[in-house]
Structures are given as C-alpha cells and as structure tokens.
C-alpha cells in the first residue's frame, strides 16, 4: 500500500508540473507496476495489454466514445442552442428571472444531445448572455445561470464522462445513462429555484422580459424538433433495447450529421468538426490508456484492499465512508480539472464502494451505477467552484469583458442546491436507480 501512496504523490507532482496526464499516469503506472511485481517483462506485458485493449478490432464497443464526441460537436456547430433558448424564453422570459430560467432549461436540452459541460457552457454563453444583458440582468445572475446550467452536460445523457467511468469500472453505459436522467432533471428544477431565490432577494438582478404571444411560443417549439428527435432516437433506442449503446452512438452521430446538413452547414465546417472530434477522441483514448495502466498498478499495490481493511477495522459506518470520499472529491475539485480528478480517484475508490455494497444495503450490481452518478454530481460542483472552475473560465474566454470573480459571486445559490441534490442522491439511491431498475431490472 505504501508504494501506491508514493505513486499517487508522484502523479500529483507530475500533474502540478503540467506533465500531460496521459503520460503521467502511464509512466507512474508502468514503473510502479515494475517495482511492485519486480519484473520488467510483467510491466511491459501489462502496458501492452492496455494498449491492445484500445486498438483491437473486436473492441468496437469503445467506438461509443468518439461517436458521442462527434455527435456533440455536430450539434454544437449546427446551432440548435438558439432554437432551444428561443423556445424556453417564450414560455419563461416574462417572469422575474425568467431569462435565466430559460437559460437553465436550454442548457438541459442542449446537454441531452451534446454530452460536454464545457461545450454546453460555451455555446449557451454566446446565445443567452447578450439577451440577458439587453434586458438589464446583472452579470452575476446571468453568467452563473450559464455556468451552472452548463454542468448538466456531463449528467444528462449521453455523457462523455459517464462513458469514461463505465469503461474504467466495467459498468453498463446504458444503465449509467438511465441512472443520470432523473438526477439531471432534478438539477434543472433546483437551478431554476436558485434563480427564483436570487431574484426574490434582489428583484433588479433579473427583470421581466416582454410576454411572448402564444402563437409565437408554439412556433418557437417547432424549432426544437431536431433536439427532441435526436434525443428520442438515441436514448429511446437505448432505454427500450432497440439497439446497443454503441449502435446508438453511431446512429446519433449520423442523425446529427444529417441535421447539420439540413441546416446548410458547409462541407468545410463539417470537415473541421470531423478533425476536431478525431483529435479529442485520440486525446481521450491516450488518457484512458494511461488511466488503465495506473489502475493496474494501484490494484497490484493493494491500495483499495488496504484502505477497505483500514476502514473495516475501525468499524466506520458505510455512509460515513462515502461522505469522506465525497469530501475528498470536493477538495480535489478545487485544485484539479474534473477529468483528471475522476481518472486519478476512481481506480482507488470504486473497489472500496463495491466492497461496501452489503453494508450500504445495495445490490452489488447497482452500487457502482449509483456511485457513478454521485461522482458525476460532485464533478459538476467542481466545474463551478473556485479556483479551478473550468466552466467559469470557459465563460471568461467566450466573453472577454467578463471577470471570473463576477461569475463566482453569483454561483453561491447554485452550489448550495447542488450540495442539497448530492446529499439527496447519496442518502436515497433509489432516485438514481429507479429508471435503470425499471428498464433493465
């Protein structure tokens, strides 16, 4: 166990020195495994196995990752966010704080076909912020609603983070997608309540916009048919077992391409999306390979088993163990980027949680699905908390005159409702597990 702790410390040091995480995890995992096993051939064999896993043709299931990345990039380029925001604004804009609520709803809808928090936040900033500024919204509320709404991109399926978690823990991606839908919907409602609370305290923060006549509202709904159709096709097919998650990813990417062509997106733009998606997927696969090598080292060094024995020997209540794990995630989220945090910690914590399944009163089949959802929610919180808060910095890059301190000041009520949601999902696993049990019981 000592070797694993030393390796973990070395890995954190390499990350702080800005060594690319894929190489840092791969190097620490390789040399750590060599040290633990005392055999260079064994270390080379393990690294080779991890590499082969990602390139062998029979592992076509891994294509789910680049396909969902491609779908999200095509949807973002096709401009669906504008129609989503227009429809939500038509129904909510006339209320106090209504444009911020419309932003949250539009973020939820965009997340359902995008799968990336950063892309959701960046795209919605270009669409929603000019409108809210035009009606006199305070920047604290306007930008906070975009940054918080953007976090829904990794929880409402399809989600790239969920795919990575599923690959690392060998869990069903379709069950993870089913488990994320209800918590994501709850997140939309709670963020809207956070907006209501903000404008209740300060009515000038979110003035009313003009009321949109019903004919215009219904006309605006016609603009979101593409999102609804793609969402129903991909997730409906997965949930009702019409096709596998891998097939759904391919169908979703084809559907997004067709929709982009119908929107008259030029071939040059489509080529740029393909290149961007290929680069992103290559980076993710290298990171995943490094994470798998590091995971092998952590397991060989006995860190999860050692921690589990330490916890069991102290008679620590299982939910207190989970609470400590979540606290560690919150602390790490303040200094680490979200993907790095998940890749670093999941290999350590998921065997512990799996071992605690009987004490938690959960079926071993479902415990890691539940754990995956609460990990994603913690990751959402890390995306909007200082000092790292990637969604906040994405907003600052999209809106040059925006100060990050302005966004962080407005984030407090959204972080509070996120913590409430996290507590509810942790103490009531049935919230996350109801849909996957219903569909795949």
Predicted regions and their residues:
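Alpha-helical transmembrane segments of multi-pass membrane transport proteins
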Residues: 1-441
């Amino acid at each position: 166990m000592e070797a694993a702790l030393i390796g973990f410390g070395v890995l954190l040091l390499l990350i702080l020195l800005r060594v690319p995480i894929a190489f840092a995890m791969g190097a620490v995992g390789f040399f750590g495994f060599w040290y633990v096993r005392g055999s260079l051939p064994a270390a080379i064999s393990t690294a080779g196995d991890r590499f082969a896993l990602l390139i062998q043709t029979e592992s076509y299931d891994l294509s789910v990752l680049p396909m969902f990345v491609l779908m999200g990039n095509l949807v973002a380029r096709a401009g669906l966010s504008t129609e989503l925001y227009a429809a939500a604004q038509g129904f909510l804009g006339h209320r106090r704080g209504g444009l911020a609520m419309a932003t949250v709803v539009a973020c939820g809808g965009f997340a359902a076909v995008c799968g990336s928090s950063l892309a959701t936040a960046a795209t919605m900033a270009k669409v929603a912020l000019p409108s809210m500024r035009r009606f006199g919204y305070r920047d604290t509320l306007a930008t906070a609603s975009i940054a918080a709404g953007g976090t829904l991109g990794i929880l409402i399926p399809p989600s790239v983070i969920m795919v990575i978690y599923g690959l690392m823990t060998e869990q069903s991606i379709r069950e993870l997608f089913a488990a994320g839908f209800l918590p994501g919907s709850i997140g939309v409602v709670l963020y809207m309540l956070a907006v209501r609370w903000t404008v209740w305290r300060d009515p000038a923060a979110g003035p009313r916009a003009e009321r949109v006549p019903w004919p215009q509202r219904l006309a605006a709904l016609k603009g979101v048919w593409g999102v609804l159709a793609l969402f129903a096709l991909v997730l409906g097919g997965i949930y009702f077992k019409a096709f596998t998650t891998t097939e759904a990813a391919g169908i979703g990417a084809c559907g997004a391409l067709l929709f982009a062509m119908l929107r008259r997106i030029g071939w040059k733009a489509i080529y740029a999306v393909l290149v961007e998606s290929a680069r992103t997927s290559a980076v993710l696969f290298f990171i995943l390979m490094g994470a798998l090598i590091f995971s092998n080292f952590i397991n060989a060094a006995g860190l999860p088993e050692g921690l589990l024995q330490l916890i069991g020997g102290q008679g620590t209540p299982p939910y207190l163990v989970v609470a400590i794990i979540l606290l560690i995630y919150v602390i790490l989220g303040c200094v680490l980027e979200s993907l790095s945090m998940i890749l670093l910690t999941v290999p350590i914590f998921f065997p512990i949680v799996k071992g605690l399944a009987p004490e938690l009163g959960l079926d071993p089949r479902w415990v890691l699905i539940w754990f995956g959802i609460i990990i994603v929610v913690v990751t959402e919180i890390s995306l909007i908390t200082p000092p790292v808060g990637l969604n906040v910095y994405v907003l600052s890059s999209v809106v040059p005159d925006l100060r990050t301190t302005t966004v962080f000041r407005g984030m407090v009520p959204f972080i509070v409702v996120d913590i409430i949601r996290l507590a509810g999902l942790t103490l009531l696993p049935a919230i996350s597990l109801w849909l996957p049990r219903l569909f795949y019981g």
